[in-house]
Amino acid sequence: CQRKIIAPGLIDIHVHFREPGREDKETLATGSLAAFSGGFTRVCVMPNTNPPLDTPESINFIREKAEECPIYIHPIGAVTKSQNGNDLTEMGLMHNEGAVAFSDDGLPIQNGAMMRIALEYATMIDVPVINHAEDECLRAEGLMHEGIISTQLGLPGNPDLAESAMVYRDLELAEFTGARLHIPHVSSMKAVQHIREMKSKNEKVTAEVTPHHLFFNDEALTSYNTNLKVAPPIRTESDRKALIDAVKDGTIDCIATDHAPHTIEDKETTFDLASFGMIGLESCFGAVNKVLVHDEGLELGNVLKLLSSNPRAIMGFEQDLFSEGTDAE
């Protein structure tokens, strides 16, 4: 065989399959097919569904429905009830039903005291907490990265400070509580610097980056392409390079797509009205291979670890896939 790659099944620990509630955007079944076509055999679905995955029963619903799908699907439970940011869910019971981590993804936990409590509870069941790292007051009505390009386009900006301030807070809370903290979709140089510094003294901190933050910079938005309207936003070329360097030196542990499908109506509209998010499961490996292997010269084997063994370790999944008697992926 030529121009073929044999690798362990890829794992994406950050996807949005929209079921229950928005099956017009994606279902577990259609999301599974997208994942499988991209080489993924295992995914973790975020809880911002309708209703959210905030009860043991909702976690069990995902687990049972996932048995009909061609890949492994693991639910991530909501940290707070209805993702309201104030009332903690029954994390222990949800974990017993199969929740592999906890997050209010899409709705950052603004209350530092609540984030502390969530981290403390997570230590009891030894699972990571994943907080969408944006200060909502600093983010305000930002539609893209705040900078020269946003000024030229006349679009409200979302400063990198909105991310880095929240990342710094969460890192401090993780060190204080001794909990496992996973930082999703890192997008800025400042956030990378905070993570790098904390990881030198706290091995329980992990981080991910998306293919689109590695591939694009904010100049790509000059066409007002709503497919590139994501949260956190695609930032400057300096930020993009900092993310690549963070992958190279291990500051960033894995790649996750933040696969977030929408309807055509949600995207084929004006930039200010378009929904945040883009799909990524099917294009992930191609984009990552282009940026990290072809452009940056990383070894393919090391890049595959970012998509397989590293996310397995973050979530505590079985690593031994090839011994006799194990289920190969």
Q: Which role fits each region the language model picked out?
A:
Residues L88-I255:
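Histidine/acidic residue-rich metal-binding segments in metalloenzymes
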Residues E64-V79:
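A glycine-rich helix N-cap at a beta->alpha junction
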Residues G39-C44, P70-H74, G98-A101, L173-L181, ...:
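Short, surface-exposed connector motifs at secondary-structure boundaries
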Residues H16-E26, C44-P56, I76-L88, D104-M114, ...:
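Divalent metal-binding segments
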